[in-house]
From Swiss-Prot:
It comes from the Eukaryota. InterPro entries: AB_hydrolase_1 (IPR000073), AB_hydrolase_fold (IPR029058), MES/HNL (IPR045889). Its EC number is 4.1.2.10. One of its GO terms (biological process) is glycoside catabolic process. This is Alpha-hydroxynitrile lyase.
Length: 258
């Protein structure tokens, strides 16, 4: 009998747990348990991002979820986009609670540079952020950069293959957020004994315009993964544009990590 798994899903910046509304029932209908984490100042959390000044505070709901697991339970931890940073942070704390890390169109940090390294490299890329709105907030530890996505940027770079209804939903629900680059640049490197010891795989979309395939391949060359799964025709928001194909990839991962 095929073993069922507990999937813990971590959303991207500026969004919330609502992005998994198509994928969650697919996984549950296959018998898996699914926890879609709502990170701080995201989704329906009423706090503004200015009230969450560090990546540790932002990630606290994920850390609490893993802390609450039964002693011998292992999860498949899926981090989407900026969620790759969140799951690396969680794996550094709870490596024994994670069967495999799944980086889904995600930033893939390493253990040799500061945690902001891949974000710093990403921000050096040409292309710009179009009609996104930038601002800053003074925190106890310095300046925190903030961003609110513009509708043209969202349509062209994140949602270009999604049903129009999902794009309209995202315009209503997306929020101001942060990559916490200033905070991440001051943090200790992720450890080999923690994050570096956990199996990791990558799921990428063939038509991702937010984190381009060339950049994804550079990250994988920089910090290797066990296997790469590619979703043909998926855009950045692949859980909305190609939910069945994403389900198929996650099912394959679940089988590989029985």
């Amino acid at each position: 009998m095929e073993r069922k798994h507990h999937f813990v899903l971590v959303h991207n910046a500026y969004h919330g747990a609502w992005i998994w509304y198509k994928l969650k029932p697919l996984l549950e209908s296959a018998g898996h348990r699914v926890t879609a984490v709502e990170l701080a100042a995201s989704g329906i959390d009423p706090r503004p991002i200015q009230a969450v000044e560090t990546v540790d505070e932002y990630s606290k709901p994920l850390i609490e979820t893993l802390k609450s697991l039964p002693e011998n339970e292992e999860v498949i931890l899926v981090g989407f986009s900026f969620g790759g940073i969140n799951i690396a942070l969680a794996a550094d704390i709870f490596p024994a609670k994670i069967k495999v890390l799944v980086f889904l169109n995600a930033f893939l940090p390493d253990t040799t540079h500061v945690p902001s390294h891949v974000l710093d490299k990403y921000m050096e890329m040409p292309g710009g952020l179009g009609d996104c709105e930038f601002s800053s907030h003074e925190t106890r530890n310095g300046t925190m950069s903030l961003l609110k996505m513009g509708p043209k940027f969202m349509k062209a770079r994140l949602y270009q293959n999604c049903p129009i209804e999902d794009y309209e939903l995202a315009k209503m629900l997306h929020r101001q957020g942060s990559f916490f680059t200033e905070d991440l640049s001051k943090k200790e490197k992720f450890s080999e004994e923690g994050y570096g010891s956990v199996q990791r795989v990558y799921v990428m979309s063939s038509e991702d315009k937010a984190i381009p395939c060339d950049f994804i391949r550079w990250m994988i060359d920089n910090f290797n993964v066990s296997k790469v799964y590619e979703i043909d025709g998926g855009d950045h928001m692949v859980m909305l544009s190609k939910p069945q194909k994403l389900f198929d990839s996650l099912s394959a991962i679940a089988t590989d990590y029985m």
